[in-house]
Amino acid sequence: FKLPKFKMRDIDDIEELKINYTLETIAELKAKLKAEEEGPHGYKETNYQTIKEIFNESVEKFADRPFIYEKFNRKEGFKGITYGQFGEDVMNLGEGLSKAFKLKGEKIMIIGETTYPWYVSYMAMLCGVGVAVPTDKELPDNELENLVKRSDAAAIIYSPKKKDQIKKIANKCPGVKYFIEMKSDHKIDGRFVGMDFV
C-alpha cells in the first residue's frame, strides 16, 4: 500500500509530523487505496493490452449471462446465446481455421449480414487466428472480385445470402483457398466448406 505524501521543507518537519501508523491507520489507508484503484464509479481499473484479453475476461466473468438474442429461424422465436457459448464457438472456429485449415496469420474476408456467425468469425480473427477483412455486403460482383484479389485473402467466410455471388467470383479468385459458408455443415467440396464443419 502507499503511504500518504506530505510536503516537507526541512528536517524539523519530520519530527513535527509524528504519525502513528497503527493497524487501524494502515487498514484505513488500504481501504482508501482500494477505493482509488476501483475508480470513481466503483469499477475496477484494468490494464488490457489486446482485444483477446477483454474477450477472455468477459467470457469468464459473464459465462452464464446472455451475449446476444437472435432469431436463427423465422418459425421460432429469439434464442439467447451466452457469453460462455460465444467463447466456445469462437475458440472452436479459431482452432479449426488455424489447425485443420492452416489459415493462422492469413487474411480472411468476412462478408454478410451482422448475425451471430458473423460475430463469431470476426472475434476469432481478433483473437489471433488471422487478419480480419470485413467487407461491405452490398458490393457488386466486380468490386467484390477486385477487393478479394487486392486484399490477398486466403479464405472468405460468407453468409448464405451471398452464396450465389461467391459462386460467381470463385473461379476468378484462384488465391482463395477456402470459401466458408456460415450456417452450413457441408463437408469440404473442393474449396467450399460449411462453417459448422470447420
Listing of model-derived features with the role each one plays in the protein:
Residues 13-22, 45-69, 88-91:
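A short N-terminal helical cap/helix-turn-helix that marks the beginning
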Residues 28-37, 54-81, 100, 110, ...:
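AMP-dependent adenylate-forming
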Residues 44, 80-87:
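Short acidic-aromatic active-site loops that bind/stabilize oxyanions
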Residues 47-48, 90, 114, 137, ...:
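A conditional alpha-helix N-cap/helix-loop micro-motif detector
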Residues 76-83, 94-142:
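Conserved AMP-binding/adenylate-forming
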